């Protein structure tokens, strides 16, 4: 409404002072060559712009209200008031009564006006208010979500504790604990087994704790809990067998691979695993305290600090290797027991078959002693010995051959007679 009142008043004044304005327009045209250069795309100032400018200065005094500036801009058709002045001082003065938006924009928009600037300011203000309102709502929603999450976490924590209490009070809990401990004991080094026993000694405290939590609370569904406990015990039992298989097979393969690496390093470097750097035992005794102190202080300056030293197994690794060997030995005995027994019997049978009875060998030895100078029985002697001993001719021949080999150098008469016989044949 204020805009319309100013606009009508200015139009009436314009009609009354038309002649005076024509004279002023002529003066302005004469001054245009001396004014600063304007953009060619902008329209030149008109008499209406000049009239409005003069009326704003004369009627509204300081001319600082945004509504008057908006009215002048609307009538001017979007032309910038800065281009209507002839000096920089006039331009700076005109900027004093322009609206903040118009002064900032410089009126350079082709179809912009003061009224549109006021509308845009109102829209920006409303937008900011709506953003602040929506931001506060988001903060409230976040707080509510955080509270809900905290409540859900507390409920879930209580449910977990309640489930643990029901499991501890179940009849199959002892079997479940035993199966779990059995899995732990399989690959645990021997020197660390007391830690498991110490934890088992404290199990009563844990049972008492959860028993207190479970008092006054309804138990879980017996069917679901029974099914869970049964399946979990079976699962741990199956897992125990898998761990045993892993220790017997895969762990032993790892131990053998490590041993092969040690042998390869020994062949390349010539230093056996476990050998020192040439220091004597007395030097080791002197440096023992210093090495212990450095280890406790966190120093890692030793030869094995970065894993580049000799591959010396630790005590836990030795115990694990010994356990693996015992397991494999027991497994081999159980799997190949029958074959081992058969092989042993076969060896003994062959030994018995190759060894002659004592009474028969005494007869052969008697003949050997009586014919020590020439221990070569004739065919008649062999046939008689076959009858006396009951042996085969092949066995008698083999016995005399072996006997001559055993006593070849112990009987000098035999060797000398053999040599003389050989010379006579030549």
From Swiss-Prot:
Stretches the record annotates as Disordered: 1-26, 85-158, 270-290, 406-426
Biased segments, Gly residues type: 104-114
Entry coiled-coil feature ranges: none
GO cellular component, one term: nucleus
InterPro entries xrefs: ELK_dom, HD, Homeodomain-like_sf, KN_HD, KNOX1, KNOX2, TALE_homeobox
Transmembrane feature ranges: none
Location of the ELK domain: 327-347
Alphabetized UniProt keyword annotations: DNA-binding, Homeobox, Nucleus
PROSITE patterns, per database record: ELK, HOMEOBOX_1, HOMEOBOX_2
SUPFAM superfamilies linked to this entry: Homeodomain-like
UniProt GO MF annotations: DNA binding
Record-linked SMART domains: ELK, HOX, KNOX1, KNOX2
Localization: Nucleus
UniProt superkingdom: Eukaryota
GO biological process assignments: regulation of DNA-templated transcription
DNA-binding region: 348-411
Keyword Nucleus among record annotations: yes
Tissue specificity as recorded in UniProt: Ubiquitously expressed in the mature plant.
Ranges of biased composition (kind: Low complexity): 15-24, 139-151, 413-426
Protein function: May have a role to play in formative events in ovule and embryo morphogenesis.
Recorded family membership: Belongs to the TALE/KNOX homeobox family.
Alphabetical list of PANTHER family matching this protein: HOMEOBOX PROTEIN TRANSCRIPTION FACTORS
Protein name: Homeobox protein knotted-1-like LET12
Organism for this UniProt entry: Solanum lycopersicum
């Amino acid at each position: 409404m204020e805009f319309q009142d100013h606009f009508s008043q200015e139009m009436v004044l314009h009609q009354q002072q038309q002649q005076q304005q024509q004279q002023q327009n002529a003066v302005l045209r004469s001054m245009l060559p001396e004014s600063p250069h304007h953009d060619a795309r902008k329209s030149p100032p008109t008499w209406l712009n000049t009239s409005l400018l003069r009326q704003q200065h004369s009627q509204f005094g300081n001319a600082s209200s945004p509504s008057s500036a908006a009215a002048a801009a609307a009538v001017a058709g979007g032309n910038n008031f800065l281009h209507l002045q002839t000096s920089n001082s006039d331009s700076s003065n005109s900027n004093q009564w322009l609206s903040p938006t118009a002064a900032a924009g410089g009126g350079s928009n082709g179809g912009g006006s003061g009224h549109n600037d006021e509308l845009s300011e109102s829209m920006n203000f409303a937008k900011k208010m709506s953003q602040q309102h929506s931001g506060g709502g988001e903060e409230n929603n976040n707080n509510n979500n955080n509270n809900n999450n905290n409540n859900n976490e507390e409920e879930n924590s209580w449910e977990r504790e309640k489930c643990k209490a029901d499991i501890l009070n179940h009849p199959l809990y002892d079997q479940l604990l035993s199966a779990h401990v059995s899995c732990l004991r399989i690959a645990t080094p021997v020197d660390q087994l007391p830690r498991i026993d110490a934890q088992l000694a404290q199990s009563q405290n844990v049972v008492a704790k959860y028993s207190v939590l479970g008092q006054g609370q309804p138990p879980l569904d017996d069917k679901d809990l029974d099914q869970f406990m049964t399946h979990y015990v079976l699962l741990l039992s199956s897992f125990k067998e898998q761990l045993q298989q892993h220790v017997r097979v895969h762990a032993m393969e790892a131990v053998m691979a490590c041993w092969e690496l040690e042998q390869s390093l020994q062949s390349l470097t010539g230093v056996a695993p476990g050998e020192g750097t040439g220091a004597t035992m007395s030097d080791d005794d002197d440096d023992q305290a210093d090495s212990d102190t450095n280890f406790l202080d966190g120093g890692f300056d030793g030869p094995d600090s970065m894993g580049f030293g000799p591959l010396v197994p630790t005590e836990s690794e030795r115990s694990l290797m010994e356990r693996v060997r015992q397991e494999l030995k027991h497994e081999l005995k159980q799997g190949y027991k029958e074959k081992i027994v058969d092989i042993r019997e076969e060896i003994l049978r062959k030994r018995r078959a190759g060894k002659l009875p004592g009474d028969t060998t005494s007869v052969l030895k008697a003949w050997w002693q009586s014919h020590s100078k020439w221990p070569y029985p004739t065919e008649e002697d062999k046939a008689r010995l076959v009858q006396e001993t009951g042996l085969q001719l092949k066995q008698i021949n083999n016995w005399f051959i072996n006997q001559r080999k055993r006593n070849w150098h112990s009987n000098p008469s035999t060797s000398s007679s053999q040599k003389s016989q050989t010379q006579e044949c030549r």
